[in-house]
Swiss-Prot record:
It holds the Pfam family Iso_dh. PROSITE patterns: IDH_IMDH (PS00470). NCBIfam families: leuB (TIGR00169). It comes from Synechococcus elongatus (strain ATCC 33912 / PCC 7942 / FACHB-805). Substrate binds at R98, R108, R136, D226. Transmembrane segments: none annotated. The gene is leuB. This is 3-isopropylmalate dehydrogenase.
Amino acid sequence: MTRSYRITLLPGDGIGPEIMAVTVDILRAIGRQFDLNFEFEEALIGGSAIDATGEPLPEATLATCRNSDAVLLAAIGGYKWDSLPRSQRPETGLLGLRAGLGLFANLRPAAILPQLVDASSLKREVIEGVDLMVVRELTGGIYFGEPKGCFADEQGRQRAFNTMVYREDEIDRIGRVAFDIARKRGKRLCSVDKANVLEVSQLWRDRMTLLGSDYADVELSHLYVDNAAMQLVRWPKQFDTIVTGNLFGDILSDIAAMLTGSIGMLPSASLGAEGPGVFEPVHGSAPDIAGQDKANPLAQVLSAAMMLRYGLDEPEAAARIEAAVNQVLDQGYRTGDLYSEGMTLVGCKGMGDALLAALESPVSA
């Protein structure tokens, strides 16, 4: 029986339209194989939305996203809009989208593909076999805490302050997401905090420990954030799933991303309690190569795989896409960001064609 899904496409800026076009072709091919009907609707966000409407997130875009089963985003931003006030820049469209959809959990996988192990700056024996997931809380912590501000004190010196605050319900909901993901992966969850000096982190640790009693099959551990950062570089294979707050997750997820050696390969997902999630590559809009058929579409394609797995509960279709990505890398196809001597250099469209061929091949099944 055919299963139908409404997907909002947000190509955005820079290389976004190019990598989105490849990904839509892949999803259509997957739909034929797995009897899935995707109803795609494209909408504006970021710089392209500013140019067309004057706003980085038009109300029509948010309404379309809310009416969908999942949102696939490509890239936002570019030099063209850097002179705008911060509150009007393209990136605020993404913040508004997350808030408008109630997204609070950011999933950032970092898996070392065997074909690209030498792209990492770490030694092969350290990095080989790494497959971890960082679950970051998105809507609380020091980025959103009140009060905050900047003022001149009695001596005329400028002072600035922010507030790091979490409620127990905010901690519990991100904790349950992380425990559920860990249960489906390696059944190991490391909670990262700074409970030795921060009261907010002590509450975080207490709530995670309490939640752990509901997940007896998941091994829970705790690390202070400074030690966690060190351990990610020293021996990343010790981690399976990491859960942490907004600030710490912002830092640790970027460390984890660079373990792989290429940010052009990394997908991400942002999820809420209900409604559609947003699935997007970690990389930016790369305006310097936009329109030149040089972009690497693999992170966008893998974001579509995450959409299938975490947004639409279609894990077999997701695995098929991931197998196709592995197959084209095995065959030596590389875009410019991954190219090395002896490989076959292809552009964005060429990589898409190779992926489509792999999907039709029984080798990737």
